[in-house]
Amino acid sequence: MLPDRVLEILNEMKAERIRGATWLARKGAEAFLALAEELDEALLEDAIRELRSRIIEVNPSMASLYNLARFMPITNNRELVKMRALEFLRRMDEAKRELASIGAQLIDDGDVIITHSFSSSVLEIFKVAKDRRKSFKVIITESSPDYEGLHLANELENLGIEFEVITDSQMGLFCRKATISMVGADMVTRDGFVVNKAGTYLLALACHESDVPFYVAAETYKFHPTVKSNEVVLHERDFSRSGFRVRNVLFDLTPWKFIRGIITELGIVIPPRDIQ
């Protein structure tokens, strides 16, 4: 049985609707830290096995959780568990800094960037670009039904970055006004497909039709080492409007052929050629 504090973190992860793979991975690492702090060493090994499994089950579409679970050793050494969890968090922070610096190089003065949903990695790119005194505008889809785009709008407003919010149904129309597109990712599959908030594939198609370069920002811990696109399970959440059931598949798959490049902390990789 996992300690109450660990169960609280798992429930918080399951309930989250806005923040994505990065936030969930951080919370997952915190769960391992809490486990090491609260459980006797005699019980630790079995508890780690259970937590590794339950972390992945929070959202199997997020490779960050799978890679976190793989990173954590099955051991009864509390200090080793703490050390590995802190090391994972350190690598996450370092990866985000490097990714943001690389991604900001793609933004030129006067660019109009269209994005979908909320990605902390894309937000970091925007922050670095602004710090480098680049002038640009962001077009944000509202990203219904959870409206993650409005969360991004709040962040950009606080940063003083110009933006406008559009309904999801207008992404094809407004894509014509964009010069570049950047989105995040919850998983990059072994064969180079991107799993992200439903609607990402539609934006990629619109960008392809309008000749707008479509980039994905994803640290390498979001790359799944084994899962291919035909093995991804796209989960659906209950949703209704005016008494009618509305289909609400959370994620979609964007084929690599529509992706100009994936921005990582190691550089820009071209799928599927550069994905190992």
Swiss-Prot record:
Q: Does GTP-binding count among this protein's keywords?
A: no
Among InterPro entries, the record links this protein to: eIF2B_alpha/beta/delta, IF-2B-related, IF_2B-like_C, M1Pi_N, NagB/RpiA_transferase-like
**Domain of life from the UniProt record:** Archaea
What name does this protein carry?
Answer: Putative translation initiation factor eIF-2B subunit 2-like
Function as written in the Swiss-Prot or TrEMBL entry:
Catalyzes the exchange of initiation factor 2-bound GDP for GTP.
Q: Which organism is it from?
A: Pyrococcus abyssi (strain GE5 / Orsay)
Record text on subunit structure and interactions: Complex of two different subunits.
Family, according to the entry, reads as follows: Belongs to the eIF-2B alpha/beta/delta subunits family.
Q: Give the UniProt keywords, A-Z.
A: Initiation factor, Protein biosynthesis
Which Gene Ontology terms cover its molecular function? Answer: guanyl-nucleotide exchange factor activity; translation initiation factor activity
